[in-house]
Amino acid sequence: MGMSSERLERIDNMLKQSLVDNTIPGAVALIARNGKIVFHEAYGNADANGKKLKRDAIFRIASQSKAITSTAVMMLWEEGKFRLDDPISQYIPEFKNPKVLVNFKYADTTYTTRPANKEITIRHLLTHTSGIGYGAIDKDERMKMIYDKAGTIDLFTTAPVTIKDVVLKIAQLPLHHNPGEQYTYSLGLDVLGYFVEVISGMTFQDYLLKHLFIPLGMNDTNFYFSASKSDRLVAIQHKVNDRWENYPNTFYDVNYPIEGAKTFFSGGAGLSSTAKDYATFLQMFLNGGELNGKRFLSRTTIASMMGNQTGDLYGGGDQYYGLAFGVLTEQGQAKGGLGSQGTFIWGGYFNTQYFADPKENLIGIILKQTQGSTGDQTSWKFKQMVEASIDD
């Protein structure tokens, strides 16, 4: 497969050493080259009680959901259902006449706005340039407070709420900035999950199952799981006095994928998956939109998705943002250890990372479930060492 077995062993040793160093409680790592899995191992524990992690463990992939949502949007785009530069208000009228935040009073959370200078488009939502906020995890304290007061549920919930409920609330809230002028990580992909429902006439979950997960054979990827799979869900852990403990409920319920109402199909952060399933999704992209004889996207569409959509608004020259992923530039490749130019990259809130290198037909995925500071170095080491294991 063009990978050095000795160098793959170094990766194995690095991950084992990370357990010894106590910087991770456990991980599943997968490497694929030329469409074949060459490395797929589980390390450490799935919870703080010593349950062993297995290769088919299910992880909350959080923001790794975004690329899947973008893919669904582009599949509908290929059907001629809309244009990328259509205003979202054409399909969700509540987004008409967006407003930008001007002044905010911390004392009583009142604020003033001004009209935005343009409408939010579907492209803005795909590229995190809409100006929409990110609620509980927004970097701007004012936005956190505005979203909290409005009662938006941003992510990871067991409550009986739908994405429509939340998206219609988001539509009434102020933007960080005029659409298209800055990159601000946002709930835009949650808006697009509801957009998929509007365009397709199906629930977002049903659309993904019918058009992506079932045809791709991604049988362990979903928003919610039944009791038969619940024991495969990895616990979120954090360090307390240098010991790993199961993470408590905070602004979200840690068991959201297996408990509660199971009605919130969050396109931005709601999915859980396995390393093998996510590798399957990425391989479809490396194959130019096809897998196992089934066509999901045209290679011409993928070329647009991998193109620079954000200019210099994102990535500081090493990366730009396309329509679904961060994409490595020539400058990023020159830095070393990140992959070839065109490598696409993202990760998730609970310490999951992936990259796919089209030039080398190479995929690397490393999944953990942690919160807080742990001293974890596996993300950069894994990427650097995987690329260095190419041997052809």
Region spans (language model):
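Short, conserved catalytic-motif segment at the N-terminal edge
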Residues: 2-61, 81, 100-105, 256, ...
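Short, conserved phosphate/pyrophosphate- and ester-handling motifs at nucleotide-, phospho-/glycolipid
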Residues: 4, 66, 274
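Active-site SXXK
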Residues: 12-15, 35, 59-88, 96-97, ...
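Extracellular/periplasmic catalytic domains that process cell-envelope and extracellular macromolecules
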Residues: 23, 51-53, 83, 113-119, ...
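Structural recognition of the beta-strand scaffold that forms the well-ordered cores
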Residues: 28-30, 40, 124-127, 184, ...
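A generic structural motif
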Residues: 44-45, 251, 370
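Short, surface-exposed loop or secondary-structure junction motifs
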Residues: 99-338
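Short, surface-exposed beta-strand/loop micro-motifs that present aromatic residues
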Residues: 343, 350-363
